[in-house]
Amino acid sequence: MIDDDGYRPNVGIVICNLDGQVLWARRYGQHSWQFPQGGINAGETAEQAMYRELFEEVGLSRKDVRILASTRNWLRYKLPKRLVRWDTKPVCIGQKQKWFLLQLLCPDADINMQRGGIPEFDGWRWVSFWYPVRQVVSFKRDVYRRVMKEFSGVVMPLQETAAQRSASAHRRKRG
């Protein structure tokens, strides 16, 4: 399903933990890392696609997460010319994405990249909130910057709360 401008509708998923860190996933058999993402099927809403992709790519279900936010608008990126498949019709020149910010509600051990069938990722880790903006492949960087800027107002309070919890625990240990 490609729109008239050549963009494939897609969802992107940012999963954060209670410390305000985000899940960063390594593409299967590659050295590149990114957030989970995937196409929206015909007849599927963006939210339905997000939950399907969440299971397929990370092995989590609706009960394992809580939606904290979604982007107000669709965000687009163009593929580099070397990645465009010119022999397909219609030609897909890039992705238009609706992004979701999710809070992880289950233990980290429930994350399973193999659960959803053919794995798209072979590893993951928690990273600081802004880390992905600097590390993602260059043609996705502007979208990542815009997504993280939009979601920062939701995640920053989580980080402040985590810092307060940590300071409180440290004081209890010393006292």
Swiss-Prot record:
GO terms for cellular component: cytoplasm. Keywords: Hydrolase. Transmembrane segments: none annotated. Residues 6-149 form the Nudix hydrolase domain. A motif (Nudix box) lies at residues 38-59. GO terms for molecular function: mRNA 5'-diphosphatase activity. CDD domains: NUDIX_Ap4A_hydrolase_plant_like. The keyword Calcium does not apply. It is an enzyme of class 3 (hydrolase). Gene3D superfamilies: Nucleoside Triphosphate Pyrophosphohydrolase. Its EC number is 3.6.1.-. It comes from the Bacteria. Accelerates the degradation of transcripts by removing pyrophosphate from the 5'-end of triphosphorylated RNA, leading to a more labile monophosphorylated state that can stimulate subsequent ribonuclease cleavage. NCBIfam families: PRK00714.1-1, PRK00714.1-4, PRK00714.1-5. Belongs to the Nudix hydrolase family. RppH subfamily. This is RNA pyrophosphohydrolase. It comes from Sodalis glossinidius (strain morsitans).
